[in-house]
A protein has these predicted regions:
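Charged (often Lys/Glu-rich) extended helix/loop segments that serve as interaction or gating elements
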Residues: 1-168
Length: 168
């Protein structure tokens, strides 16, 4: 059970001084390595689907974007509409991470966690590791948004207008 493993890693051993910071870091590194290994092995083994779904949730990264879900995508949170999202560069590289997208507004409550993929709706989006190209922004596109989204969203925060690129 992955919940028990999480409790052991994040449990009270460190809080009560039984494990130092270096030991805790090593334990967490082992924990994430084991979960990644189990995830990689899942196709080769019979498994409990609910546990694998939980594992995928645990291994999903958060990618923070400089936008507001509430301003730029009101239909996403208001009527649960799913918009196509994908990287707009590094297209010749295979994505190596699974992530959800979160905004960086005053409350950071905006999150995109449903994605249209070729095989259906997914709770995470395959993305590239942004650390590979240090100093360069990782660019994503959100498509089929429609002009009225910006009007519905209003300019209610400090981020200003949504950037738009026209591709012909």
């Amino acid at each position: 059970d992955f919940t028990a493993m999480t409790f052991t890693v994040n449990g009270s051993e460190f809080n009560y001084g039984k494990v130092n910071l270096r030991q805790r870091a090593h334990g967490e590194e082992l924990y994430w390595d084991i979960l990644k290994w189990v995830s990689d092995m899942r196709e080769k083994c019979e498994h409990d689907g609910s546990q694998m779904e939980r594992l995928e949730t645990i291994l999903t990264d958060y990618y923070y974007g400089n936008f507001s879900v509430f301003q730029s995508l009101p239909d996403l949170w208001a009527i649960d509409q799913i918009f196509p999202v994908m990287p707009i560069h590094r297209l010749k590289e295979k994505p190596t991470r699974n992530a959800v997208l979160s905004d960086i507004t005053c409350d950071s409550d905006g999150k995109i966690d449903k994605f249209a993929l070729a095989d259906g709706i997914s709770r995470s989006l395959p993305l590239h590791d942004p650390e590979i190209e240090k100093g360069q922004e990782y660019m994503l596109g959100i498509f089929l948004v429609g002009a009225y989204q910006e009007t519905l969203g209003d300019l209610h925060n400090l981020l200003g207008d949504t950037n738009v690129v026209g591709v012909h």
